[in-house]
From Swiss-Prot:
Record's function text: H(+)-stimulated, divalent metal cation uptake system.
Family: Belongs to the NRAMP family.
Ranges annotated as spanning the membrane: 31-51, 58-78, 116-136, 137-157, 168-188, 213-233, 254-274, 302-322, 342-362, 363-383, 401-421
Name the UniProt record assigns to this protein: Divalent metal cation transporter MntH
Gene: mntH
Organism lineage string: Bacteria, Pseudomonadati, Pseudomonadota, Gammaproteobacteria, Vibrionales
Nuclease in keyword set: no
GO BP term (any one): iron ion transmembrane transport
HAMAP family found in the cross-reference section: NRAMP (MF_00221)
Species: Vibrio campbellii (strain ATCC BAA-1116)
Major localisation: membrane
Length: 423
């Protein structure tokens, strides 16, 4: 073989090696971009979802599965738009609102309502984790709350090491809950045909179903994670905006499909185990835990409790992060994360100390949250429809139409709730 041939072969090998390294690095960068949607998605399977989904399934069987499905599809679009706003503009939703609201009073109103929503969310999530510890380990609710407090502070410490370790931990907890509900469906044996019918047949046959639908919407489309998700894209990993958006679509799809599966599985389990066994008034998490054992076995109860712990711990951490983003975005001020953690825990300890019904608090908090959805979605749609802000990445007309439909549904449910609750 001539020297020229040898040199040519050597160059080809070098080029192939460089190409392989380049492809590996590109794949690695794309994998590094995955994760923000998993942080957002954990908010969609918080203990508030457990409470509303269990009550829906036990009271009405599979009838409200279509609400869960459509709420999850709406959430998928909204979370992508939130991510897109942050990626394209480099600013989160709260920062854009601060820049565009007419005066400081409007900014103050938006900041206060967003903080209230974050605290109300954290109340449900924190209490849910505490209840999980109480049920699984047979300790008092206050002891469960103290364990929850310590555990969440420890998880938040990871945030000091950067966003990626936190994404891994929260993503792992999301996957744990999903795996648990695969097992729960195995124990429950839901009726497949009835599930499909419930998913595909929109209907309300009872006024309480509309109340629960608002609760499901409030538990599924979470205002605080709309603010948070738009703030999780500070690192571009050297990729173009188009590449980041493409990767984010995949990230949102996977994370929200997992969250949607969990919500559907909770309703299906409650329908199969409670509704069709004559236990049609299981509205409390504690009752659900106790009732599972004689109906489907101790293992199902323990798994239910563990999923509640994983859900509560991860979602209360996300709630704390969202509160921090809201404060920084609206008033350009922040407090140490651990200080915020202790402030937002206080209402939970008060509720527990007063002996209030925890499930009532969980369900009511989700209904209250539904009133904050429109206040987050409407400006999100306005900003992502703006050519001045988004350029070539502004929403197309179909996304805009879908956004209008979502806002109309939210406002209609809110109006119904106002009439119902004040009647």
């Amino acid at each position: 073989m001539s020297n020229a041939s040898i040199n040519h072969a050597s160059i080809q090998l070098e080029n192939a090696a460089v190409s392989n390294v380049s492809a590996f690095n590109k794949t690695k960068r794309k994998l590094m971009m995955l994760g923000p949607a998993f942080i957002a998605a954990i908010g969609y399977i918080d203990p508030g979802n457990f409470a509303t989904n269990i009550e829906s399934g036990s009271s009405f069987g599979y009838q409200l599965l279509w609400v869960v499905l459509w709420a999850n599809l709406m959430a998928m679009l909204i979370q992508y738009l939130s991510a897109k706003l942050g990626i394209v503009t480099g600013k989160n939703l709260a920062e854009h609102l601060r820049d565009h609201l007419p005066n400081k009073w409007a900014v103050g109103f938006y900041w206060i309502q967003a903080e209230i929503i974050a605290i109300a969310t954290d109340l449900a999530e924190f209490i849910g984790a505490a209840v999980g510890f109480q049920l699984v380990f047979g300790i008092s609710l206050m002891e469960g709350a103290m364990i929850t407090a310590v555990a969440t502070v420890m998880i938040l410490i990871l945030n000091q090491k950067g966003q990626k370790p936190l994404e891994v931990v929260i993503g792992s907890l999301l996957m744990l809950v999903a795996v648990i509900y695969i097992a729960e469906l195995f124990f429950a044996h839901p009726a497949g045909g009835e599930m499909v019918k419930g998913l595909l047949t929109p209907t309300f046959t009872d006024s309480h179903q509309i109340y629960l639908a608002a609760g499901i919407l409030g538990a599924t489309v979470m205002p605080h994670v709309i603010y948070l998700h738009s703030a999780l894209f500070k690192n571009s990993y050297g990729e173009s905006t188009k590449t980041r958006l493409r990767t984010t679509r995949f990230d949102v799809l996977i994370a929200m499909v997992i969250a949607g599966f969990v919500n559907i599985a909770i309703v299906a389990m409650a329908a199969a185990v409670f509704h069709y066994s004559g236990n049609q008034h299981v509205a409390e998490i504690e009752t659900a835990y106790m009732t599972l054992t004689p109906l489907v076995g101790k293992a199902a109860s323990v798994l239910f409790g563990v999923s509640l712990i994983a859900s509560g711990l991860s979602s209360t951490v996300v709630g704390t992060m969202a509160g921090q983003v809201v404060m920084q975005g609206f008033v350009r001020f922040s407090i140490p994360m651990w200080v915020r953690r202790f402030i937002t825990m206080a209402p939970s300890f008060v509720v527990i100390g007063l002996g209030m019904n925890t499930t009532d608090i969980l369900v009511m908090s989700q209904v209250v949250l539904s009133f904050g959805i429109a206040l987050a979605i409407i400006p999100l749609l306005i900003f992502t429809n703006s050519e001045r802000l988004m350029g070539e990445f502004k929403n197309n007309k179909w996304v805009s139409y879908a956004g209008v439909v979502i806002v109309s549904l939210v406002l209609s449910l809110n109006a119904y709730l106002m009439v119902t609750l004040t009647a």
